[in-house]
Amino acid sequence: MTDVDLAFDEQEYIPAVAQDADSGDVLMLAYVTEEALRKTRETGEAHYYSRSRDELWHKGGTSGHTQAVKEVRVDCDGDALLYIVDQTGGACHTGYESCFHRTVDGETVGEQVFDPDDVY
């Protein structure tokens, strides 16, 4: 499937960070299975694996807030991926541009770009 060895964990997941191709902002962290990575590469749109729902997940399949994957990179240990994406709409299901929209002190630092009640 790839030209490099990937180190999936014992549950057959590998973490994937999504990064905005234009701004460089980190948008989200999710998990990928071999099937999710294959679908991402086949379609050019981000696919992840929802551990809570135990199913393959096409990012934006419900909301329309898709991620067009420009490149997939792997870290030096082969145990993490970086999806460099063109994000349509917000990446976070809470309506924010990034899932990393809060500090550990509780301060909101991100921008809410849609109302989740209108989408889900």
From Swiss-Prot:
What is the cofactor note?
Binds 1 Mg(2+) ion per subunit. Binds 1 zinc ion per subunit.
**Lineage, uppermost ranks:** Archaea, Methanobacteriati, Methanobacteriota, Stenosarchaea group, Halobacteria
PANTHER family registered for this protein in UniProt: HISTIDINE BIOSYNTHESIS BIFUNCTIONAL PROTEIN, HISTIDINE BIOSYNTHESIS BIFUNCTIONAL PROTEIN HIS7
Keywords in alphabetical order: Amino-acid biosynthesis, Cytoplasm, Histidine biosynthesis, Hydrolase, Magnesium, Metal-binding, Zinc
Q: Which family does it belong to?
A: Belongs to the PRA-CH family.
Signal peptide positions are none
* Membrane-spanning residues: none
| Protein name, as recorded | Phosphoribosyl-AMP cyclohydrolase
Known pathway: Amino-acid biosynthesis; L-histidine biosynthesis; L-histidine from 5-phospho-alpha-D-ribose 1-diphosphate: step 3/9
Q: Where would you find this protein in the cell?
A: Cytoplasm
Q: Which InterPro entries match?
A: PRA-CH, PRib_AMP_CycHydrolase_dom, PRib_AMP_CycHydrolase_sf
